[in-house]
Amino acid sequence: MTPTTADAPGFTERYRVIQSRDRRFDGQFVTAVRSTGIYCRPSCPARTPKEENVTFYATSAAAHEAGYRACKRCLPEAAPGSPLWDVRGDVVARAMRLIADGVVDREGVPGLARRLGYSSRHLTRLLSAELGAGPLALARAHRAHTARALLVGTDLSSADVAFSAGFSSIRQFSETIGEVFGMTPSALRSRRSAATRTEVAAGEIDLALPVRGPIDTVGLFGWMRAHAIPGVEEGDDRSFARVVRLPGGPAWFEVRRADDDKLRLRARLTALADLGTLIARVRRLFDLDADPLAIDDALARHPELAPAVAAIPGVRVPGAMDADEMLLRAMIGQQISVASARTMQGRLAAELGEPASVAPEPMTLFPPPAVIAERGLEVLRGPAARMRAIVEAAGALADGSLEIGPGDDGAEQRERLLAMRGIGPWTADYVRMRVLGDPDVLLPGDVAARAGAAQLGLPSDPAGFTAWSQRLAPWRSYAMAHYWYAAPVTQAWRSPAETAAAAAVARPSRRAAVVDVVANDVVAAVDDHAPDPDAAAPARGASGAPTPRGSHAAAARHQAAAPASPVAAASVSAGAVPAAAAPATLRPVPTTLPDAESETPA
């Protein structure tokens, strides 16, 4: 989005937004007013400026570069981030995700350009043309946002605020605050209200996390609690805490839900300069920059999903604190239950992890890839081929032959992962959903999601499930969240009232009940909900077809006899093609027979 003036396309729509003071658009663009020299968020309560005095910018950094300062009344820097950087997968969006993660502060513009595969000059041209500001200005705006939050929400000294926000000197910090906000750091701090202050222990930081509502905190904390690695993570229905490695050393954080459904972050850091990176990763973990009203509106247009959306407004799809850890957790969770995956992950942490002295109570850091590559086979349990695949992936992450992160191109990341032994479409796409925040990922091989679809009266066979869900693009990741929450196996994640509301929209059938048996026997959802079709080769009968075993055989016989869903039949007859099909040149890598808890791959 280049600067938008009164005669440019899109100006009228944005001007209507600021006339209505629509909070849904906060963080998606800023309004610069030439007559006052300030820029505001779309919902600013001040009088709407005249059209001829208005210019719209995609980012606050672009407004800074054009000579504007932030409005003291609406504080545009305190708005949630733009959801566009997750919806879009182009180089600009990838750059914005990496800038938020602190890459420019740690590696400079050359480091950012290298990660994206561009020269520094070309990347600067791209960002300036699209956003009105280059990478240095965008990183500076991000530092200013972090500094404002610390000045208003903590009692840290100005020096600590400066270095926590990523500034290299107190002078640079003071000059930036003055240019962006039009006041000194002490004056900005004096404007805070008593409500923004909280009592914290020595060495801790406590901040509010801006959220674009509504937000399904019940589902988020239930999800986190269900998948918490013992010793590394812990959670209940109102909070989630864990320890994590950051560039400057280990850190501990806790996100908690206040009575008004707002979220607060409490943290302890080895290096204060990691705070901006921590905030960015926590926001991604809790999907706080999503546009829930737009997502809910799009999904609710389909009558089959409307009741589920009404029962759980503001659903979120959790991201990942650490990309390498996310991949290894997903691989460990292949074809086993969530409980079994947590047990194995907890054993890894207990035997190979390091104590995290930064935490307020004893906790352990999840072992890095290099340690798992060296000693993982001593601890991991399960089919030998799968364990070797996990260790090989850890080795590739450790030596740099495999790199994944939030700045990846989605298609390229998927191709790299599928080239690894033991990684199939489910794992590759699940990692893309969690690490990149891709809003349009469907997992046809996910048993729990298909069980949830059956509960909602939707096709639950992989082909029908894929074909029907195509109409939900580009929000299929959020549809997956609704499918997961509709599955019987996840009902314990929600409070009794929430469970009753979710159950009221389900339409169980005899066929769905059989699928539920499979889902409960195999998986529970999320990190590890489903078998990856390429993680293990199924047993084969004389005909060469997969041979179902145990309860799966009963389910297979029942599904073979059951009539096809009318919705599925209509979708397939319409010529729908599964969007998540793997490239033809990438072949499944057979490993071993399924273990006792795995389902025969479809």
For each of these PLM feature ranges, what is it?
Residues 1-602:
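HhH-family (HhH-GPD) DNA N-glycosylase catalytic core used in base-excision repair
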